[in-house]
Amino acid sequence: MSDYLLQMNGIVKTFGGVKALNGIDLKVRPGECVGLCGENGAGKSTLMKILSAVYPHGTWDGEILWDGQPLKAQSISETEAAGIVIIHQELTLVPDLSVAENIFMGHELTLPGGRMNYPAMIHRAEALMRELKVPDMNVSLPVSQYGGGYQQLVEIAKALNKQARLLILDEPSSALTRSEIEVLLDIIRDLKAKGVACVYISHKLDEVAAVCDTISVIRDGQHIATTAMENMDIPQIITQMVGREMSSLYPTEPHDIGEVIFEARHITCYDVDNPKRKRVDDVSFSLRRGEILGIAGLVGAGRTELVTALFGAYPGRHEGEVWLDGHPIDTRTPLKSIRAGVCLVPEDRKRQGIIPDLGVGQNITLAVLDSFSKLTRIDAEAELGSIDREISRLHLKTASPFLPITSLSGGNQQKAVLAKMLLTRPRVLILDEPTRGVDVGAKYEIYKLMGMLAAEGVSIIMVSSELAEVLGVSDRVLVIGEGRLQGDFVNHELTQEQVLAAALSQPDSHNNKDRKSA
């Protein structure tokens, strides 16, 4: 009998004559966690769709061996029956159903006569949550009453209830806090010890290094290398993923910092559902020409509320003033903000950044269509010229600007949103989680673009939950905690510990507005 639980040999998948996968191999032993690494568009998702029979046997070439026997599944239900379960990045839970009902969805326990056996399902659901070290979870409550970390655990419990022997985890930590990520990684280690195998897909290479035994890298649809993690480090993984040496994940583009051009004065935002509660409380700061200002803080600190208020997009009541070049400007709506020279690339690009029904080019020119208008017609030639220039400038990978934007990888969708805002020629560019869900190569290009824009005199505000990213690209760092300004640091030998200490400190324990640190 084979030592491997799973063997995918010579997998080839073709779309319209183009090989998306060209001879990919992937092997997983029982109790092993394999990190599947590659840039967006490398073929990771296609490979997992083949494994889980989203693309059934016969639509691809090669072979899959499961426990040494050929697997020729025609449906997801067949692969799940075999013990292969995928947990998608976007969770598949039904918010209004209870935790127990979600765990048993499609596999409900019934009594004679066909009625649901709720006591048995609740008992089994409680046992599964105890196994995942969440003994106090009320499995009778709607799953919507629990946060992202708990919902991720419910998805894992759902998979274990299907007798999963191989878990495929696709970007499992994308919506989790740092503490929730640590819980998730501990649970994966426990599952490994019980013989459950995992394929872990993540752009967060520190997580991959922490939990995976083996790293398998694919690039442009081809298998590059499979190596034991103990013989690898993160820079080596990055080099294999992008196909070139990267001296640093954070490129240093020299840029001069000039005079103060932008000021936020006494910004206060009130909760949409509870108008008496302040989500942002009297925050003031300044920004210099060509400066990159990072905003750090814990989840729920009020960072996104602050920057959406600066752009005129905060849905609740908010107060304060925004000044540019020494004068107050009108930022009551996004359109007024754009016209004043202030632009925002939002946190959730799928809901707020792109229009999925439009093409790549249409999304890019959406904010400046009036500049291509001639009476009642659009100057299509001028519009296409601008689109092509931005695609080239941002190294946006697309076969055609007329393709649907949903056909692009996450990193290239983000570049399209950036291109849209750059066409407005902003003086101040606000980036809210600009690299979330973006692969390491695209991250590098976004950081490099930020440095180039700063060198051109554009002032940048960047919100990020990744402290390493904040420290890697920012000239100055603001720390927000419980809606208040907790620290204003010059980024010279600044450490993650200093930033975290400021984020965790009590808002009234010191005079934040005068706080500077080297």
UniProtKB/Swiss-Prot annotation:
It is a peripheral membrane protein. It catalyses: D-xylose(out) + ATP + H2O = D-xylose(in) + ADP + phosphate + H(+). Its main location: membrane. SMART domains: AAA. ATP binds at residues 38-45. CDD domains: ABC_Carb_Monos_I, ABC_Carb_Monos_II. It comes from the Bacteria. It is found in: Cell inner membrane. GO terms for molecular function: ABC-type D-xylose transporter activity; ATP binding; ATP hydrolysis activity. Keywords: ATP-binding, Cell inner membrane, Cell membrane, Membrane, Nucleotide-binding, Repeat, Sugar transport, Translocase, Transport. InterPro entries: AAA+_ATPase, ABC_carbohydrate_import_ATPase, ABC_transporter-like_ATP-bd, ABC_transporter-like_CS, ABC_transptr_XylG, P-loop_NTPase. Residues 6-245, 262-507 form the ABC transporter domain. The keyword Metal-binding does not apply. The complex is composed of two ATP-binding proteins (XylG), two transmembrane proteins (XylH) and a solute-binding protein (XylF). Belongs to the ABC transporter superfamily. Xylose importer (TC 3.A.1.2.4) family. Part of the ABC transporter complex XylFGH involved in xylose import. Responsible for energy coupling to the transport system. This is Xylose import ATP-binding protein XylG.
